[in-house]
Amino acid sequence: MKLKYLYSVAVATLLCLPAQAQLKLDGGETKAPYIIPSTDSAVVAYTGDYSTIHVASNCEYNIQHVANDWLTVRREKNGNISLFATYNYLVAARQDSLMLASSDGKYERKVYVTQSGNTMSGPLYADVKISGVSGVANQAQGGYDISKSLDGNVATFYHSPWGSTPTTFPVILTYNFNTAQHVDYAIYTPRQDGNNNGNWGQVLIEYRLEGSNEWITLKDTNFGMGSGAASISFGETGIDNVKSVRYTIKSGYADDGSNGFASCAEMGFYQINTVTANEMNTFFVDKLCTQLKPNVTRDMVVGMKNEVLKRLAYALLDGNYSTDYRVSEYRAYKPVGELLNELKTSYTYNNHENPTGITFEKGERVAVIVDGLENDGISLQVRNFGPSEYNTNWYALKNGINVLTIINKGNGYIDYYTSNFQHAPNVNVHFVLGKQNGYFDLTKGHTNNDFMELLANATGEDLDLVGQYAQCVFPVETLRANTADGRWTALQFDSITYYERQLMGLFKHNRDYGNRQAIITVPKSGGLYHANNDGCCIPFQALAQPTTSDPNYFDYWGMAHELGHVNQTAGVLWIGLTEVTNNIMSAYCEHKLKKNGFHRLENESQGFRYYNYLNNGIMKEAKLLPSVGGDVFVTLIPFYQLLTYTEGTGLQPDAYPDLYETMRTTNVPAIQRGNTSENYYGDGQRQIYFCKQWCDITQTDYTDFFIQTGFLKPVNEDIGDYDTRRLHITQDMIDECINYVKAKNYPTPPAGLVFIDTYNKNAFRDKVTVPANIAIGTGCIKSGSNIQIQHASWPNVVGFKTYDATGNLIHMTNYGHGYAGSNNHYEPTYTVCAWNSAESPARITAVSYDGSEVTCYQE
């Protein structure tokens, strides 16, 4: 034994010597080269620590190693080798190797390196899922029975009936244990396929004890029809002797206008592991485990059984543990389904509130500690917005420690949506040893310097830009390439959503609850900009304008257009208007935010759309359809003129806000998808309803304007507008509407209202007319078949009309038609009127706001 000990000491001493010292032991004799590493199978911890391989050699050697993304190899001056490994987020171990070769190439020695798999889940000390569970449902769609919620596969799910035999609420799902169990909590996982149908609303949860037929109420709660997995607590200490648990589902989500469905991807029941709970109480001061008790030493930590708590304890003892994003407080939000139903919008608001600034890797095992959760369930949403992948998964969270295996990589969000959002407490969450990516937040006063620092240190693919009203998620690589001023870019999205909410009356009528609107990135195959329940979706290849910091390049109209799709409200939307009434928002936001003075409707194509509206719409008595020149922007103009006259002039700035509120709070005529029946009037009734409500809200008789602009014209046509439905308005419906308004004895708006735009609106505000004493021909320049008329020569003009010798109206010309504006100089100084000899024009009149006319040119 003594000889073996002495030999070991000698070898150890040799290995600690540098190569030069070892050569002296050879007595100057020439020996065969040797390289002796202390191990040829090195093991590195998953935590990303470094390791040293001692090397004894009698020759110079080099290290041959193929570089990779997790292992760095360095030879030290004393001849030893240092191994530096990144953190291993995966359950599986990973291997590498390196070759030690003498300089003359005559001798080689291979060393294998293994990094341990991530053991942070602490498999022996995780919570226990109860087995031996069966289920019974009072109704189910064929092939979607309750067993699908117990098979451990979120891709399969229980679903209540649809089709010819619809769901009848309540839907009752009963889960029975083979033997009575202690239950601490349950986890309800909604379907994870991107379809919200069947997500739970109001649910009564009951349990039955062994040997009893009595059902005891646990809670009656609203899950908010959200997609996040939810933890259902059975009390602080759990409940013993439970034999059955029953869910009586009273409401659920449906996207087809039906009464709803019920579905469930997985239902699990759990018992809390007491070993982990005891270690949290023994070693840490607080429930979030952010501070060790004063008496805790490294020797004590060695004996901890929960691997993640042990690693955390070491990090806290080292004194360099960052909690910037790992430990945060999160608020509750109104469920997006409830908000949609209240606001009657077309799509839901942000479904990934509460960014954490933590990024996750696929297969990573993580620990999340929660404190402060009361009656409502929360979950961790991990979502990747590309460009490498686009996936989302949810993980239910409970108070205490939650050990999770992450399915897809992405950024983390705390899903905390509850009907009780106004009174629900904030919850505190600790992502133990989480990988910090950070997020930019206008509400925290972040500057562009903060933005640049976040980009420089980003660890994930995507970065969240958070404002008070909007939340953007863009690829880091795109922001690095395009965004010189992240604060400015984030502020533009926040301002767009602010002005849209202002126009919708959410501020005036106290319906802004803090829920943001989302702007996200989708795959290249996503086509063009579009909107859905995820918000404003921007394909990866189309990110240049939305992420720019150049005010002349930023796409105000396009972003407001897609966010406006989300905000399109029943009553301000019927067939033919899907790409129209959202642009009320675009025009409003463009006017408020675009600093170079450009206005799309007035300036694009030198005012051609207005000209088309007047000559092919008003003059030809067209119906209100996108078929006017095949241009939805032409159909937009009368809605825009109502906005300009009320809000733009400041005469009635609350008209549109009050209109939206009326549509939210009254019985708007219902529409039926795909209905092309001769007897279907739903969309036509909506159009009539809009006219009535506008007149009542403004206390003004707009019936003449609505007749001129085609709102009150008989129509009976099938219209294709993402759906095909019939727009059917009879003369009787029109007469009833006109009689309804006339009976109110409201005053009428100015007769020249069809000419109003943003450049001539002050004449309507100030009620000023064109002077009658200006000499005919003043400021008029003939050039070929056109007459250019200078506005300065005809003050207060709002438009022009051209007549032939017999007094027939040939043309209506909008203010500024033909004016070629330029950056910061878009307000027109002249109008170009057609003077085609083939039409025998005789004179042009300057039109005032009240419809009166003064001849300004004649031949």
Regions picked out by a protein language model, each given a short descriptive name:
Residues 118-178, 191-198, 275, 800:
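Disordered, acidic Ser/Thr/Pro-rich linker "stalks" and the adjacent N-terminal cap
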Residues 276-336, 645-769:
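Pan-zinc metallopeptidase signature
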Residues 279-440, 782-855:
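Beta-strand-enriched, solvent-exposed domains that form extended recognition/catalytic surfaces
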Residues 92-104:
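A short beta-strand micro-motif common to beta-rich folds, especially ectodomain repeats
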Residues 169-170, 195-274:
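Trp- and acidic/polar-enriched beta-sheet ligand-binding modules for extracellular glycan
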Residues 34, 52-84:
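Surface-exposed binding patches on compact interaction domains or structured appendages
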Residues 451-454, 461-666, 690, 694:
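Catalytic cores of extracellular degradative/oxidative enzymes
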Residues 168-170, 178-187, 241-242, 360-366:
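Extended extracellular/luminal ectodomain segments enriched in beta-structured repeat modules
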